[in-house]
Amino acid sequence: MKRSLHLTFVCLSLFSARMCVQGNQFNIEVSRSNKLSLPGFENLTAGYNKFLRPNFGGEPVQIALTLDVASISSISESNMDYTATIYLRQRWTDQRLVFEGNKSFTLDARLVEFLWVPDTYIVESKKSFLHEVTVGNRLIRLFSNGTVLYALRITTTVACNMDLSKYPMDTQTCKLQLESWGYDGNDVEFSWLRGNDSVRGLENLRLAQYTIQQYFTSVTRSQQETGNYTRLVLQFELQRNVLYFILETYVPSTFLVVLSWVSFWISLDSVPARTCIGVTTVLSMTTLMIGSRTSLPNTNCFIKAIDVYLGICFSFVFGALLEYAVAHYSSLQQMAAKDRGKAKEVEEVNITNIINSSISSFKRKISFASIEISGDNVDYSDLTMKTSDKVKFVFRDKLGRIVDYFTIQNPSNVDRYSKLLFPLIFMLANVFYWAYYMYF
């Protein structure tokens, strides 16, 4: 019996001590230089219902926001999103938290659970989290007139629709939108505290591939099935730094095009040298094109500006290889034609000699009284040609002229014209390319 009473006494003592500790935690008093004692949190929130908004049933709560952008850690073209760390600060007035004096005091972040706070969320956010090191990165500050300051440190990944048709000379416009999840415009009204000056930190950011050109804030309305909501919008423009891509892709591809032109100054007879240059430049351009497309694996549905330029360079490199094939083939054809001409001349001389010898022999063996056969006065007027033979002769003559018209008479002129036309056309293509993608 005594043991039972002893255990009961110990339990009551421990419970009393526990209640005293909890009471001390909620009895918050802040002393200023003038020794003003602020009310305890427990007394201030007596009868407070955190499940009801301020002015419940009356005017909507006016919530003013400010935003500090600490960092933009990544911008993904493949996933079309960006990841940013922000400091979000919200201010509103809750008349239930008015106390005497003109001072303010900061509460432990864990006491936020006992107050009403807005259900603000980030529109189009894929994932977000509140920092918890070393404690939850939240701040709650009460002012004597009932104003509440609620600050959070959040890292969020937000969707950003990107148009990559001008990549890498593109400028992307991304948004950060804030809205109440459950309270519509009849309960909560959001606003920027100081307009564009409500957002800070963007002008100081240094990004790897982008430069922040400008940003501005706005307030819009979001009409949804559950009501009409106030939406705060931060819109900022990101201009890509093209210098990196010029050094990585544009300069090497241009050098490969120029390298392919070296073959124009090599003799047509140097088949291995010209073939090696042509094949090497084509393979190198193919590698560049594959590397460019694999760097953005999920954006291959876009025909990007860099793809257009690499396509132009590949056309010129492949064209230089085809130019040698045409010139070399024409050279072989010309040599074959010369050989055929010489053989034909020899054949004609042989035929003429045979005919002349045959006529001379015929003259000696046969003689006619009324006809004198002579090589000079033979009349061929009675020899006629059939109509079908005439048609074949005319057709062959026309076909031969057409073939001669498209046949390169001097293959060395192919290289001579290519030395001028290839660089000239490539320069014009560059002028149109850069003018279009930089200014249109």
UniProtKB/Swiss-Prot annotation:
Glycans are attached at residues 43, 102, 145, 196, 228. Keywords: Cell membrane, Chloride, Chloride channel, Disulfide bond, Glycoprotein, Ion channel, Ion transport, Membrane, Signal, Transmembrane, Transmembrane helix, Transport. One of its GO terms (molecular function) is GABA-A receptor activity. It catalyses: chloride(in) = chloride(out). Residues 24-241, 291-301 are extracellular. It is a multi-pass membrane protein. The chain crosses the membrane at residues 242-262, 271-290, 302-322, 420-440. It is found in: Cell membrane; Apical cell membrane. GO terms for cellular component: apical plasma membrane; chloride channel complex; GABA-A receptor complex; plasma membrane. Disulfide bonds join 160-174. Gene3D superfamilies: Neurotransmitter-gated ion-channel ligand-binding domain, Neurotransmitter-gated ion-channel transmembrane domain. Its main location: membrane. Belongs to the ligand-gated ion channel (TC 1.A.9) family. Gamma-aminobutyric acid receptor (TC 1.A.9.5) subfamily. GABRP sub-subfamily. PANTHER family: NEUROTRANSMITTER GATED ION CHANNEL (PTHR18945). Pi subunit of the heteropentameric ligand-gated chloride channel gated by gamma-aminobutyric acid (GABA). GABA-gated chloride channels, also named GABA(A) receptors (GABAAR), consist of five subunits arranged around a central pore and contain GABA active binding site(s) located at the alpha and beta subunit interfaces. When activated by GABA, GABAARs selectively allow the flow of chloride anions across the cell membrane down their electrochemical gradient. Pi-containing GABAARs are mostly located in peripheral tissues. Heteropentamer, formed by a combination of alpha (GABRA1-6), beta (GABRB1-3), gamma (GABRG1-3), delta (GABRD), epsilon (GABRE), rho (GABRR1-3), pi (GABRP) and theta (GABRQ) chains, each subunit exhibiting distinct physiological and pharmacological properties. GABAARs subunits share a common topological structure: a peptide sequence made up of a long extracellular N-terminal, four transmembrane domains, intracellular or cytoplasmic domain located between the third and the fourth transmembrane domains. This is Gamma-aminobutyric acid receptor subunit pi. It comes from Bos taurus (Bovine). The gene is GABRP.
